Amino acid sequence: MSTRREFIRQAALATAALSSGSLFSAGAMSRTKGIVIGANDLIRVGVVGVNSRGLALASSFAKMPLCEVTCICDCDSRALDKCLAQIESQTGKRPKGFADIHKFMESRDFDAAVIAMPDHWHAKAAIMALQAGKHVYLEKPSSYCPSENYRILEEAAKHPELVITAGNQRRSWPNIIAAIDEVRGGSIGRVRYAKSWYTANRPSIGRGKAVPVPAELDWDLWQGPAPRVSEFHDNYIHYNWHWFYRWGTGEALNNGTHFVDILRWGLGVEYPTLVESVGGRFRYHDDWEWPDTQMITYQFGDAAAGSWEGRSCNSTPVDGYGVGVAFYGENGTVLLGGGNEYKILDMKGAVIKHETSELTFEPGNLINPSERLDQIHFKNWFAAIRTGSPLNSTIRDACISTQLVQLGNIAQRVGASIAVNPVSGELVNPSPEASALFTRDYEPGWEL
């Protein structure tokens, strides 16, 4: 594997290449087809990892104009069969199904890969897709650990003909864009501090018992780049992997990534200079390893400060919202909840502006309630592929925002504040423990 400094050098080269989404002004090239995808061409999509979010993405992409979901991949045949049936019921066409991601990426039957696998797979799958000549939609977080962010940027810089974006879909939601314009345009004066949060009331995952691997699951493929475990436990999958160090990244990257990304966007900052975290697994005594209660704070030099509060087991709202971001300025506050709306409050807390939209969540859509909003983000990716227009969420921005939250998790696990180079994102004079968490061990043969 390359050294971290080599990652950073490659990331700097990637910045210019990725800032506009594509270097091809008349449409991006996909080596899958070997031709330019033009403004009116069909884009063939393959989706990998379809148990939950991937099923929602596949269903939503299948409804897009000039798009066909042609390939589906999952190493659990139950998830694969369910998704294949869903797309067939929507479109009348049954996509090709793959259990093995290697064979999926080799297929010439799709141009663009949508990656919605568990977190430990994100960077590996994105790199495989780029190397196979696929455009990439990478669900958040962009990676499992900071070193993988640099590796993704290194690989993306080698393929300027391909368009890679990330699932930070709120960067395309109209009223979120308008709210950031308010913040950065001076509507509340200079902003020096912003906070973000996520609340839920998740149950215990209990103490797992060793059981046989389900016959429908290829457990080796599911583990992929992660070091192997000796036993399969009944509380590992499909969602609980989020809470284990080996595969997941905790609530901070499961949901915090979305809102720290908005925070960073509004403040106009990149890497911090200092990161601290407090918290722990407080609510239940079970196998859940990441915190269920966490407060991460960021110092961005003399420019600004920010924070993220995560409460996985106490859903009491903050400022009326279960999730959100608040920007505090000299003359008031811009407040965003989880949907496509925002408020401006004066210094006494009175609402002086409330922007809403008919584009909102659809409770009746049980597969993807935010589908209409998410499809705006998908359209932006497709436009970048077809015409080279700018991405709303570049992979560079996604990697930086992901890394901010990863740095908070490192501080949490080492139990100490960490200093960060604000230009490169590297740790400054790190402890051996912090350095070890900047990267990870890989299963032999599965390295990036």
Tell me what each language-model feature is.
Residues 1-138, 147-163:
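N-terminal glycine-/serine-/threonine-rich beta1-alpha1-beta2 phosphate-ribose binding loop
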Residues 31, 177-178, 190, 195, ...:
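Contiguous beta-strand/loop segments that form the cofactor/metal-binding neighborhood of enzyme cores
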Residues 44-48, 69-73, 114-116, 137-138, ...:
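Structural recognition of the beta-strand scaffold that forms the well-ordered cores
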Residues 50, 172, 371-375:
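Generic alpha-helical segment signature
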Residues 76-79, 98, 118-122, 142-145, ...:
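Short, solvent-exposed turn/loop segments enriched in Gly/Ser/Thr/Pro and often Arg
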Residues 135, 143-221:
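A contiguous active-site-proximal alpha/beta segment in oxidoreductase catalytic domains
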Residues 140, 186, 388:
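Conserved G/P- and acidic residue-centered "switch" motifs that form tight phosphate/ATP-binding loops
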